[in-house]
């Protein structure tokens, strides 16, 4: 669905139906303090897109976000996942399996996505350590058709928790 520049389309899916939603303006970050602390230190708070997305994902509901470039869509998707990994890691440790799969249409975009994951992962890790909590060891990787066999084998033996692929 194409949307005019500057217009936000946000939809909730219940499996069959799609309905536009509105945010009532009242929002608190639904994240672990290490996650919300990184976001607040780095950006001062969420964008409108992120606030609306996180209000939905905090309820474990599916969402489709269409918004202009630079509005925070990628972080809106990934920070919820990072938060869940942090909480699970602290509670019981992270299983050696892929928890988050991001499928990209382009190899170059896959590499950009992974690069953009490094800052929040490092920031959350630092936040955990500053709180006296252990690093939960979230691993991420990119796998494309160009990924060498040795690296693929490493991923098989110790799967990344976040896998970006084409």
Which residues does each predicted region cover?
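Helicase-associated low-complexity/disordered flanking segments
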Residues: 8-49, 62, 129-133
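Conserved P-loop/Walker A NTP-binding site and adjacent catalytic elements of P-loop NTPases
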Residues: 36, 46-165
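Targeting/processing segments of secretory and organellar proteins
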Residues: 2-3
């Amino acid at each position: 669905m194409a949307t005019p520049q500057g217009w936000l389309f946000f939809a909730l899916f219940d499996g069959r139906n799609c309905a536009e939603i509105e945010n009532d303006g009242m929002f608190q970050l639904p994240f672990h303090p290490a996650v919300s602390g990184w976001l607040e230190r780095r950006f001062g708070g969420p964008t409108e897109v992120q606030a609306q997305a996180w209000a939905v994902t905090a309820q474990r509901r599916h969402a489709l976000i269409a918004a202009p470039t630079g509005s925070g869509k990628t972080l809106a998707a990934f920070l919820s996942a990072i938060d869940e990994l942090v909480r699970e890691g602290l509670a019981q440790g992270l299983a050696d399996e892929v928890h988050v799969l991001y499928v990209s249409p382009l190899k170059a975009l896959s590499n950009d996505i992974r690069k953009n994951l490094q800052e929040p992962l490092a920031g959350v890790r630092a936040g955990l350590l500053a709180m006296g909590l252990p690093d939960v060891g979230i691993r991420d990787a990119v796998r494309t058709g160009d990924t060498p066999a040795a690296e693929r084998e490493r991923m098989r033996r110790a799967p990344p928790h976040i896998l970006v692929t084409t």
